[in-house]
Amino acid sequence: MEDMLSFWDVAIYFSAEEWECLGPAQWKLYRDVMLENYSNLVFLGLASSKPYLVTFLEQIQEPSDVKRQAAITVHPGGKCYTCKECGKGFEHKKVYQNHRRIHLRVKSYKCEECGKSFRFPSLLSAHKRNHTGQKPYNCEICSKAFHVPSLLSVHKRIHRVQKPYKSEDYGKTLHCPSLLSQHKIVHTGEKPYQCEDLGKAFRYPSRLSNHKKIHTGEKPHKCEVCGKAFDYPSRLSNHKRIHTGEKPYKCEVCGKAFHDPSKLSQHKIIHTGEKPYKCEVCGKTFHYPSILSKHKIIHTKENLCKCDICGKAFHYPLLLSQHKIVHTGEKPYKCEDCGKAFYYPSRLSRHKKIHTGEKPYKCEVCGKAFYYLSILSKHMIVHTEENPYKCEVCGKAFDYPSRLSNHKKIHTEDKPHKCEVCGNAFCFSSSLRKHKIIHTGEKPYKCDICGKAFGSPSRLSKHNKIHTEDKPYKCEVCGKAFHFPSLLLVHKRIHTGEKPYKCEVCGKAFYCLSTLSVHKRIHTGEYAYKCEVCGKAFHCLSTLSVHKRIHTQEKPYKCEVCGQAFHASSKLSHHKRIHSGEKPHKCEICGKSFYYPSRLSKHKVIHTGEKPYHSQASGKTLDYPSRHSKPKTIKTGEKPNKCEICGKAFSFPSLLSIHKRIHIGEKPYNCEVCGKAFRNPSRLSNHKKIHTGEKPYKCEICGKAFDYPSLLSKHKIIHTGEKPYHSEVCGKAFSYSSRISKDKKICTGEKP
């Protein structure tokens, strides 16, 4: 034990002449250093009893009193080793050599685990216990264990409720003098320890040392279960509870339990509603000082570090350095499993969870688990339906402030991100990146099940749910389920009738914003998405994607009942109603039901008598746009869809598909009453009217009823006497187009 340090080995000695030269500043420095040296010895367990001189210093005596006490207590004789730097004397050579390391800053004792160095072997021994987890010093009252005896001594004061060190300003009492010194800094607001990289300041050197590990990336404490590394042993301890499921910190108000005490402290503020940290500029209050610090940057905008390439500004040089990597394209952090590279190590850490399947954050309401806490927080809003952030222009509410900020750009029409290829502009840079994939054709994200490729990982994630059929979001009104909460929200508007998105040109309203965006292109005439095969242009990308399947003959959506395949999922959904007999769209006037809303809209024209579509070719007004567009196709003679067997051509691919069934003999649509089969669903629908005797289309003049609107239209010509169809051979006029074909054969002498 003779080689162990004592208080007198690290004490500062002054001669009588030197004491007389000390001014108030030097006296204060002497006092602080002496108390700090004693605190270090206590921490290492090397102080058996408190010297009387230390008691004097703690009680803040006058310099003259301390001078007398130092002269009595400190013995100058018997010290053969004198330090040249500070004049201090030592009896033993080894103690003198250890003392010299303080001036030379030599740290000879290195930790083999993490590489950290120390001046004394006793400090290294105490440090090693952090790695081994050894805590040999136990509290006799509560059995809590500690690495070093000094921490045990401080802990014991909790049981004795002994706090001998009192703050003069606020009267707060503390267990030890070092805590009192630290506490005083809180009142002064002083942060003397500054980070050279980020500029961030701290009250204590220990906090600065901890902070520096962010820049160095040092994480010596590794989890044995999942391999995740941490910068501090306390964080590793908290992390381990994720695997064990242990939540020892419980809220007294609501009973919610947490892994670590800091999370509990944060949670408690929810119940109290306390926001003690106020912004001096705008008066906004916050729960935590860290959030206030981040908020203050909005007002200051000082000392911004600007990017030379794009001009983007940052508050800290570290953030600028991270940003510059985006321009260089360098992605130094690579995933060992799939080879994907990232700009930042944090992004790589998040990505790795996909491979490990670790989803430590679980929803207490529905049991769904998530990779990240932030995504769980977002998910919880689905259950609460809380949308606290409201748009001042249109009144729409959002769950997050970032989504409100993005939404506001719709009203300002500010689209700073422009595509260099086609000139299309976007509100957000992310939207521009997604758009560029259209021009490059790049689809790096592939589905493992069906092999389908996508331009973005989010699209692949959405697609994967088709295979799993996991639809956790259910409508309370009709029971329909959805993959995503956003789709459920849009669907609910069908029941409520809410259409918040209105077209400024024609006044038409829509359930969702994307439908309004597509609709607007009708007025602008914008067809941004063009088919490379046939040159046909479309308003939106999804319509182009569906159209391309006509050329590739790809039909990924198959009916489980009859095996018929379709280009688009919407077509399959419509087709399924034929088998189920579901007709959800009902006419309010006559009660007739339809499979599709478009059919109901067409049907309503019969009751209103409205004919809004005008044919430029014949000058006639028509009740349906199809009657206007189909004659145009016939007139131009355009029939691009040709049958490979007989060579017959058709205007539309749907007609070609129906025609092909003649050759293969396929009749997938069966009548449930008589068993008769048909090639297409419209023929089956017409046939069913024979059994029901239904004739919903009635002539207003003579009262005659018909099965179909086409027969009613033909019948009306009898009353009007109109003959719009002229023979090119003899010039004779006819009421029906079919009569022209018969007349041609009579005039030419052709025998049918």
Swiss-Prot record:
InterPro entries, per the entry: KRAB (IPR001909), KRAB_dom_sf (IPR036051), Znf_C2H2_sf (IPR036236), Znf_C2H2_type (IPR013087)
Key word DNA-binding present: no
Top-level taxon of origin: Eukaryota
Protein name, UniProt field: Zinc finger protein 728
Biological process annotations from GO: regulation of DNA-templated transcription
Domain named KRAB: residues: 5-76
GO molecular function term, any single one: zinc ion binding
Region (Disordered): 611-636
Keyword Zinc part of the UniProt annotation: yes
Alphabetic keyword roster: Metal-binding, Repeat, Zinc, Zinc-finger
Positions annotated as zinc finger (C2H2-type): 81-103, 109-131, 137-159, 165-187, 193-215, 221-243, 249-271, 277-299, 305-327, 333-355, 361-383, 389-411, 417-439, 445-467, 473-495, 501-523, 529-551, 557-579, 585-607, 641-663, 669-691, 697-719, 725-747
SUPFAM superfamilies per the UniProt record, alphabetical: beta-beta-alpha zinc fingers, KRAB domain (Kruppel-associated box)
Gene3D superfamilies per record: 6.10.140.140, Classic Zinc Finger
